[in-house]
Amino acid sequence: MKLTRRHALKLVGASGLALSLPTLGRAQEIEKKNLTIAVGGKALIYYLPLSIAEINGYFDDEGLKVKVADFAGGSKALQAGVGGSADVVSGAFEHTINLQAKGQMYRAFVQQGRAPAIVLAVSNKTMADYKSPADLKGKKIGVTAPGSSTNMMVNFYLEQNGLKPSDVAFIGVGAGAGAVTAMRTGQIDAMANLDPVIGTLLKENEVRVIADTRTVADTKTIFGGNMPSACLYASEEFITKNPNTAQALANAIVRADKWIQANDAETIAKTVPATYLLGDVELYKQCLDANKESLSPNGLVDADGPATALNALAAFVPNLDASKIDISKIYTNEFAENADKKYPNV
């Protein structure tokens, strides 16, 4: 059940954000037209709405000039946002929780994903005899970057199965061809990554999947509820000073969300850059079909999503006191609701 406007206003009212939100249907002056969005792994299906918004000209339609800065992982993109080299981050929802725990107020304002779409797989070369999670102890596990959402998923999985993050060695391998090479050459024994990286390795029977969050059902099994994933987030200061800019960004992403749901894998594969395909268009289309459910249909955060994300994060982040996190301040659905009304169809 999505939040109503009244409920959303209640949630964000304490911060004063609601007072600055754009009014639907009235022309609004864009406060900041030139923007940099940081992302960790732009070619990933996880961030497909960002690419579609850029390729289809949705940012341009909103009067924005957007530069996308691509980094090796979500934690690097986060650093760019906090450091000031990017205005907005296209990253994992749970980063807003981590930031609040450190006294930095950031808010997700439009969703690209409604399930993490992260797959944990073991090597059929170095872990051919894998039988249970206990076999991961002492192994090298590849993640897109230390501290990223892939790292978080592995930590949570380890905790669920009686292991600690310190029981394994994490190695950053990125989210592209380098990750595939790391697995094939034996640099790592297991990997938490996304498609098309995972799909590439599965095609050649090089890995075996042991945990999968590409579907809503599997995500609920692993995390205990809906787990919001890719989003656009920015500092509270940025959103408060630039509400019309935030609305324009949300409009573009919601249009992209809906376009993806309305088009088949063939059309999407022809739309994205050839480099996204990792040399195999048929594989990419298979990955699109496997991940489509994980992508948001409307840019909204599910009602139980923030609490699920907080519980997952609190399970392994040292010294993170969930009772001190105000989840009403880590997201707002107001911009996405406005965008959904402005663009009810593709």
Briefly describe each language-model feature range.
Residues 7-27:
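N-terminal export signals
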Residues 310-346:
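Conserved C-terminal helix/tail region of periplasmic/extracytoplasmic solute-binding proteins
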Residues 28-175, 189-195, 206, 210-213:
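Short, glycine-/small- and polar/acidic-enriched structural segments
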Residues 239-320:
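Secondary-structure end/capping motifs
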Residues 178-181, 185-273:
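Pocket-lining segment of extracytoplasmic ligand-binding domains
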Residues 61, 128, 132, 215-225, ...:
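Short, solvent-exposed loop/beta-turn-alpha elements that line the ligand-binding surface or hinge
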